[in-house]
Amino acid sequence: MRMAGQDNIFAAPIEKLGDFTFDQKVAEVFPDMIQRSVPGYSNIISAIGMLAERFAKPHSKIYDLGCSLGAATLSMRRSIQQEGCEIIAVDNSAAMVERCRLHIDAYRSDTPVQVVEADIRNIDIADASVVVLNFTLQFLVPEDRQMLLEKIYAGLRPGGILILSEKYIFDDEQAHELLINLHHDFKRANGYSELEISQKRSAIENVMRPDSIDTHKKRLTEIGFSSTEVWFQCFNFGSMFAIK
């Protein structure tokens, strides 16, 4: 396996700019791409481990849905102290799954990890104490989000937690534009050019459709979660928890 490289996928002009996909090219540079594109990503990954340590129950299942290269899975695996837990990491990208398995296998642990190549909408969720959707739900078509969240709720044990990280939109137009501009400033500060920012935005706008924080909270509450709150936010990116 080649080491992860620097993200320059959108550095040169692309004549026919298709929709963004999590293919081999993206998998090879994903760690660099996500660190330079998502403000606070490392903090979120670290805190997912902390939350898993608090909420993982003995002999339960932990799900990382849309696991990409396994950063959240590894954070939880390092943190979980409970006996008999199993982590099920799922992604529909063959390139991501292949590299995820290599990353997972590079670390020894008493907590087994099953890496599954599948559509997260088709995964059975049962006996779960922790479920993670780390910047994943936003890539599902909006009409499938409720169904997946209902399935997660049904598969969680009472007292279990859903950790939901997403990019957000805002109803206040001035605030929305300011937070987008601050995010672009963040990307510029991390070495992305105007061309890269523009081309990435065009490629991803048809496949990533963010919701507002209020939409997330309303949906989770209607499904039955007893406690929902944003625990981290930086610009228009953040993470929420929802407790059953």
From Swiss-Prot:
One of its GO terms (molecular function) is carboxyl- or carbamoyltransferase activity. InterPro entries: CmoA, Methyltransf_25, SAM-dependent_MTases_sf. Pfam families: Methyltransf_25. Keywords: S-adenosyl-L-methionine, Transferase. SUPFAM superfamilies: S-adenosyl-L-methionine-dependent methyltransferases. The keyword S-adenosyl-L-methionine applies. It comes from the Bacteria. Catalyzes the conversion of S-adenosyl-L-methionine (SAM) to carboxy-S-adenosyl-L-methionine (Cx-SAM). Homodimer. This is Carboxy-S-adenosyl-L-methionine synthase. It comes from Photobacterium profundum (strain SS9).
